[in-house]
């Protein structure tokens, strides 16, 4: 939470965090729609530029400078990833209720009042937006579906809960999330390890206002690895189970070979191709397990070495800068 705000500035009722990346064509419209929805409430909008290469940072800076403190612009020094940007934004929020939505207009701000109402009515900690008609590209939909299946195994989340980027949460969750000091933040993983008071609400999913999706196979893979290795030791347990299964199959195979050599076909020599295939198989499994262990150790090394979650270049709050 920032301590540089003006003392006489009113505490907002709602804070809205928007990670920004190459969205100069849509961010103005998103901010305008938010103001139209919450015209009667005191709100705080936190725009976090995650190393955009277009003029998104300049657009966000202009919005913040003319907002009388209602918009906070956080500029990161480079691209750290969406979840790091969200974490940076959450650390600047002040309101008792906080929302996170995308910068492309696909998460309609008009859905936020009903999501906040659901949060309060059911006394939940987090409410996710459940997209009724997803407008994502087919590639993104496949990646999201796979990510959801993996999350069912890796994270302690309720079955059927869709972990979307469109969500609202209370202050308790925000305060717990910003305590995380590791170098690879995964917001939904932090939420699931903090609480089981999670819900979802059907919401609209709009087409992009401008541009194209910034998600690529590399970004989706990186996100999946953060969830797969950063918030669970299930992969290590699975490799142990895999080792036991292979050992059991090897014993069965050895018994079968002995029976074959002693009683069925004692004069037939075992094939070299079979032996080579087994060596290649077991070598591949060993390298996979070693690579996974190495990834865990590498993450521990980076955490101990002070790998930053994000680096803030500048913060603009109305007429003040820091």
Q: What do the predicted segments below correspond to?
A:
Residues 23-37:
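Short, well-formed alpha-helical segments that are part of the catalytic scaffolds
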Residues 98:
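Short aromatic/hydrophobic "clamp" motif used to bind/position activated sugar donors
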Residues 43-46, 57-92:
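Conserved donor nucleotide-binding strand/loop of the catalytic core
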Residues 49-58, 105-106:
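A conserved acidic beta->alpha catalytic loop
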Residues 74-78, 82-92, 109-190, 206-225:
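Acceptor/aglycone-binding surface of glycosyltransferases and processive sugar-polymer synthases
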Residues 2-11, 186-322:
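Hydrophobic helical membrane-anchoring modules
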Residues 13-15, 44:
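Cell-envelope/extracellular polymer assembly enzymes that use nucleotide-activated donors
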Residues 76, 101-103:
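Catalytic metal- and UDP-sugar-binding loop of GT-A-like glycosyltransferases, i.e.
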């Amino acid at each position: 939470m920032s301590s540089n705000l003006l003392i006489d500035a009113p505490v907002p009722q709602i804070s809205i965090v928007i990670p920004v990346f190459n969205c100069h064509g849509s961010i103005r419209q998103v901010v305008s729609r938010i103001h139209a929805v919450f015209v009667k409430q005191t709100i705080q909008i936190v725009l976090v530029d995650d190393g955009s290469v277009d003029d998104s940072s300049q657009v966000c800076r202009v919005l913040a400078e003319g907002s009388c403190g209602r918009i906070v612009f956080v500029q990161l020094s480079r691209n750290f990833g969406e979840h790091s940007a969200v974490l940076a934004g959450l650390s600047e929020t002040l309101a008792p209720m906080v929302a996170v939505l995308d910068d492309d207009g696909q998460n309609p701000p008009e859905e936020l009042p009903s999501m906040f109402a659901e949060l309060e009515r059911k006394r939940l900690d987090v409410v996710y937006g459940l997209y009724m008609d997803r407008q994502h590209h087919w590639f993104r939909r496949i990646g999201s579906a796979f990510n959801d299946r993996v999350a069912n195994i890796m994270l302690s989340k309720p079955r059927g809960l869709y972990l979307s980027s469109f969500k609202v949460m209370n202050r308790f969750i925000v305060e717990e999330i910003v305590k995380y000091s590791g170098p690879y933040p995964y917001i939904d993983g932090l939420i699931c390890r903090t609480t089981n008071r999670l819900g979802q609400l059907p919401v609209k999913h709009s087409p992009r206002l401008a541009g194209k999706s910034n998600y690529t196979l590399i970004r989706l893979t990186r996100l999946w690895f953060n969830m797969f290795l950063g918030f669970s030791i299930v992969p290590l347990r699975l490799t142990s189970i895999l080792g036991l299964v292979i050992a059991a199959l090897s014993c069965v195979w050895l018994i079968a070979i002995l029976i074959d050599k002693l009683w069925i076909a004692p004069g037939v020599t075992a094939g070299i191709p079979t032996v080579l295939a087994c060596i290649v198989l077991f070598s591949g499994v060993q390298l996979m397990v070693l690579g996974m262990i190495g990834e865990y150790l590498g993450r521990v090394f980076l955490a101990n070495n002070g790998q930053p979650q994000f680096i803030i270049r500048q913060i603009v709050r109305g007429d003040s800068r820091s």
